[in-house]
């Protein structure tokens, strides 16, 4: 059977005078296309409004999937790492954060691999007890490059250093790569069971992996926006996710 990839949704929160309660749920198009190209089945999974149903629903979803993919999206609510909201924090969705945290814990308990992109690496870090810079420009003194780049997502804008011997370095086959950049938040204190394996020139965390297992790999950039045109090699992180799933299904 083809691997089934669970992808949590975002919701489009806008006032619609015709259908005021119609909040379309969606997942990133290029993420879906990457998995289809590689022979996997993307399953879009939506979060409930009622947070009392989150834990059971997360357990039910994890039984249906072979791996959990955490895509980009809105900022993570700082409530989940014990902070007040910074003046420059963007939109947050409490139910989404609560749901994805439950999905992460359920997936790890079921020995099912996780792959995170952008917000995905951030919510994984928070779920494991880590913290975030709520706004790099305001809170990160060593900032030297623009991380929320104002350009098309398929184009690389800055370099990333990959840790020698890390999964990321092995996948890309070199110690430095060039990536796109579409974020204003980043990993601060690293969560339990995680390690940093990629950094930007100014030290901002760009990649993380599990310390003792192969269950998690995450990147801060958006490989899904680059593989179709500018950098086909960016598919390697998607293929690695499927390879990890295959290993855990045996």
Language-model features, listed with the residues they occupy:
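Post-Walker A helix-loop "phosphate-sensing" segment adjacent to the P-loop in P-loop NTPases
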Residues: 129-133
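Active-site-proximal beta-strand elements of phosphoester/diester hydrolases
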Residues: 217-220
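N-terminal beta1-alpha1 cap of cysteine-dependent amidohydrolase-like domains
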Residues: 1-115, 126, 137-171, 176-178, ...
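Conserved G/P- and acidic residue-centered "switch" motifs that form tight phosphate/ATP-binding loops
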Residues: 118
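The feature captures the ABC ATPase H-loop/switch
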Residues: 121
């Amino acid at each position: 059977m083809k691997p089934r990839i669970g992808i949590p949704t975002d919701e489009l929160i806008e006032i619609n005078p015709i259908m005021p309660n119609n909040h379309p749920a969606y997942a990133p198009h290029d993420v879906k296309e990457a998995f289809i190209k590689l022979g996997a089945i993307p399953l879009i999974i939506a979060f409930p409004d009622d947070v009392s149903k989150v834990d059971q629903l997360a357990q039910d979803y994890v039984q249906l999937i072979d791996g959990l993919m955490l895509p980009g999206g809105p900022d993570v609510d700082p409530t989940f790492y014990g902070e007040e909201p910074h003046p420059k924090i963007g939109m947050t969705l409490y139910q989404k954060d609560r749901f994805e945290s439950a999905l992460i814990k359920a997936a790890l308990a079921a020995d099912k691999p996780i792959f995170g992109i952008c917000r995905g690496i951030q919510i994984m870090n928070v779920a494991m007890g880590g913290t975030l810079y709520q706004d790099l420009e305001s809170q990160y003194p060593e900032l030297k490059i623009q991380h929320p780049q104002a350009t098309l997502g398929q184009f690389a804008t800055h370099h990333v250093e990959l840790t020698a011997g890390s999964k990321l370095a092995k996948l890309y086959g070199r110690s430095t790569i060039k990536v796109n950049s579409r974020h204003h938040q980043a990993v601060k204190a690293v969560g339990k069971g995680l390690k940093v394996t990629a950094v930007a020139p100014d030290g901002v965390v760009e990649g993380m992996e599990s310390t003792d297992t192969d269950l998690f790999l995450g990147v801060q950039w958006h490989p899904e926006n680059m593989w179709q045109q500018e950098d086909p090699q960016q598919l390697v992180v998607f293929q690695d996710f499927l390879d990890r799933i295959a290993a855990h299904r045996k």
